[in-house]
Amino acid sequence: MISWLNGLKIEIWENGTRKGVLISCSGVGYEVQLLSRSLQLLNTSKELILWVHEVHREDGSQLIGFLNKLERDLFRKLISVSGVGPQLAISLLEKNPAEQLISAITKKKIAQLTSCPGVGKKTAERLVIELQNKLSDLIGSSLKKTNNHLELEYETNVADEVRSTLLNLDYKNSEIEKAFLEFETSSKSIRSKAQESFEVSKGLDFETLLKETLIRINTESG
């Protein structure tokens, strides 16, 4: 099973509602379907690292790729639910960043889940029933009871995911670290540690940190 690819972007392709990238790895070209927001980040990138799930079908196999391991692993959890296929799982991830989707499932936010095209009330309820207690390991989170409801505490180092994503997009580690430091100074949302890594405070998700980091990198280069 293919689970990870490192290679050069040849072209971006589109087939109906599905979009993706052709990536060349050791002389072999792989067509990989991606989330729309992932494609938007790949416009200026040549060398890619993708976390991949391989779907086996009667007419062949299909590769679905993600820019970080969290999204790939969450995708695998989603398709383990009865009635949730690969394309519906992609639709859920298109509508909600991984951290928000995990929160919606663990907190039983049926309305948020059904706002995704193709997800009815029964499917949303199955997602909650089957996954509610199976997602905390994905982001190193812990669940605790607070006022009779579940509250999700993030203990993951989101900065590591953002750093990995930006390195995959050909940004230099030095400019990423500089952007992190600037964001730390301006918001105090990132705490510098002895190993010169960063721990994101609770409440700051992947999408927010990625956006803020890119703003600072692009401002510096512009």
Swiss-Prot record:
GO terms for cellular component: cytoplasm; Holliday junction resolvase complex. Keywords: Cytoplasm, DNA damage, DNA recombination, DNA repair, DNA-binding. One of its GO terms (biological process) is DNA repair. Residues 147-155 are annotated as: Flexible linker. Residues 155-222 are annotated as: Domain III. Coiled coil: none annotated. It is found in: Cytoplasm. Residues 1-67 are annotated as: Domain I. One of its GO terms (molecular function) is ATP binding. It comes from the Bacteria. Residues 68-146 are annotated as: Domain II. Belongs to the RuvA family. Homotetramer. Forms an RuvA(8)-RuvB(12)-Holliday junction (HJ) complex. HJ DNA is sandwiched between 2 RuvA tetramers; dsDNA enters through RuvA and exits via RuvB. An RuvB hexamer assembles on each DNA strand where it exits the tetramer. Each RuvB hexamer is contacted by two RuvA subunits (via domain III) on 2 adjacent RuvB subunits; this complex drives branch migration. In the full resolvosome a probable DNA-RuvA(4)-RuvB(12)-RuvC(2) complex forms which resolves the HJ. The RuvA-RuvB-RuvC complex processes Holliday junction (HJ) DNA during genetic recombination and DNA repair, while the RuvA-RuvB complex plays an important role in the rescue of blocked DNA replication forks via replication fork reversal (RFR). RuvA specifically binds to HJ cruciform DNA, conferring on it an open structure. The RuvB hexamer acts as an ATP-dependent pump, pulling dsDNA into and through the RuvAB complex. HJ branch migration allows RuvC to scan DNA until it finds its consensus sequence, where it cleaves and resolves the cruciform DNA. Has three domains with a flexible linker between the domains II and III and assumes an 'L' shape. Domain III is highly mobile and contacts RuvB. This is Holliday junction branch migration complex subunit RuvA. It comes from Prochlorococcus marinus (strain SARG / CCMP1375 / SS120).
